[in-house]
Amino acid sequence: LQGPVGPPGDSGIDGVDGQQGPPGPPGPPGQLTLTLSSATHRFPVVDCSALYASGQTTSGVYTLGPGVQAYCDMETAGGGWTVIQRRLDGSVPFNRTWEEYKRGFGDPNGEYWLGNDNIHLLTSQKAYSLRVDLMDWEGQRKNAQYSFFKVSGESDQYRLHTISGYSGTAGNSMSSNKGYRFSTVDRDNDYDGLRHCAQVFGQGGWWYGSCSGSLLNGLYYRGCGNSCPPWQGVVWHHWRGWRYSLKAVSMKIRPW
């Protein structure tokens, strides 16, 4: 007869390790958390300069983060510019409310404003420069570049915290805007005690003092030459004066 089963023996020696499997798919891009006085905002560490450095050298619309698209100028002055404002043909009205300027509006394939929240978050990450490209109705082109450009958050009314280090061919029409808070047709933050500049001059959101030597978000006029309504159009005073409304303008930023 067969006896009972005995106890199990000792474990054998471990076998050799198997081969490492193939690498998994890449994870999502990392994000930078910017902590402001009122809230914590998450914004991807992506702008057009980073895209340019990664090999994206064709100008066009790119995604900077969830729900945020911008036109990237990959050709002008070394490329890598994030366009925060553009006027081309008057197809998008810029007489908008505070909330619209806060969020941004328009189409990055054409005319648009990137949004004050986005502009603030970008320029708070690192030191940025600003380039303004201008074209009149005769096809002449000028530019203004500022080595330092920074916009404060909403708690400070999107103040133009820093704009300095001018160079270029258009004249320095934004020096008078430094330190001023952003105003819109429904939010009067200017320093003019007699007028609401955003309502009286061009109806566009801007950094008004009393009131401004530039207004790139004013009303879009065609065919009025040097006889446009004063301070109502797309104005760069040091180039074409305050009665001339420009045909095309763009504001673009890049870290340095």
Regions found by a protein language model. Give the residues of each.
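Extracellular/mature segments of secreted proteins
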Residues: 79-84, 204-209, 218-222
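C-terminal helix/juxtamembrane-tail motif
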Residues: 229-256
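Surface-exposed interaction patches
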Residues: 144, 156-217
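Sequence contexts marking disulfide-bonded cysteines in secreted/extracellular proteins
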Residues: 47-49, 71-73, 196-198, 210-212, ...
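Collagenous Gly-X-Y triple-helix motif
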Residues: 1-34
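Extracellular beta-rich globular recognition domains, centered on the fibrinogen C-terminal
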Residues: 43-178
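N-terminal entry motif of extracellular EGF-like repeats
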Residues: 27-52
